[in-house]
Every structure is written in C-alpha cells, then in structure tokens.
Amino acid sequence: VARMTEALLNGGVQERVSLPHKDVPMPRAQDAQERPAETPAGETNSAPGMPRAVGKRLHRVLEVGTGSGYQTAVLAALVDELYTVERLEPLMKQARKRLRELGCRNVQVKLSAGGIGWPQHAPYDGILVTAAAVELPPALLEQLAPGGCLVAPVGGPAMQELRRVRRADGGFAYERLELVNFVPLILDN
C-alpha cells in the first residue's frame, strides 16, 4: 500500500516528503517485516514501507478500508481532511480508538461498505482503495473531484493490477502501475 499512497499523493509531483516512520507505531506483527500483516479480523494491514515517501499535501481524501488504522494515521499527517470507511465494526472501533490516542483530529471514521464511499463529504482530491474490485465502483469515481486521483487494485482473485485514475476534461484517464495482490473489496455489508 505504500506504493498506492505514493501513487496517490506523489503522482507527477517533484517535491517529496519523507515521514519519520517511528511517529506512527506499527502493529506488532509488522515490526521488522516488509510485508502486510493480518489483523485479528482476518483482513490485512499495509506493508510498513508503503507510506514512507509521499508527496504534495491534498485537502480532502477518502480511504476505503481503514483496517487497523495504521495507514490512516500516516495519511492523516499528509492531508487536511481524511475520511475513511471500514466495513468491519471491530476494526472500525479499534482504528477509531488508535487514531484518537495518536491525536489524529483531521480523521473521520465510518462503518460502511467500501464500494459506496462516503458521498456526503465528496468531492475528494484523492481516493485510496485498499481492497481489490473486479471493476472500479462507479460511486467512487463519481466522488472524485476534477483533477483528483484515485488509486486502487483492480482485478479478480488470481491477478490484480494497481491503477491510478485521474479525473480530467470531463472524463477519466487510467494508468496501470504494477501487479499486486489484495483482499477483495466487499461492495455491501
């Protein structure tokens, strides 16, 4: 997911920001590993290296898939307003508590299926989807602001590719970034 974060926040921007990784405590299972860790609910957390180097500050961002809140806390330091949705109530509560303890005051967490996003706060300058959809949900594309960027894994369980989508000129420009492997996006609760 670090490459996802970088693709979202640093797409085409020369200025880079390096985060001190120690500011956001990693989940214990991730401590010396450069791979995703499984949460108690059976979901996965982003690999720790994913969010380290990112670029320009965005105003309003939607994260689909809060998980433990680790990546959310990193993103919160890089954006003005962060809205994040999680479909599993135990994970949402755990993340909300963690974010409160870390002093992340610019984050709102909601229990919701990821495929519908959070239209009440749209449009978003950036949308980061942390689970794979066979096709990008139209509801998420509709919530992207003009000039905004959405990064998501797209494909079936066997093969997925990380895509960056930019909204411009009344349409969308799609870019394939790399092959990835993510848990499936659940479109409804």
Describe these PLM feature segments.
Residues 2, 23, 34-36, 81:
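Low-complexity intrinsically disordered segments
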Residues 11:
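Glycine-rich phosphate-binding loops of nucleotide-dependent enzymes
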Residues 50-168:
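Conserved nucleotide-cofactor-binding alpha/beta core module
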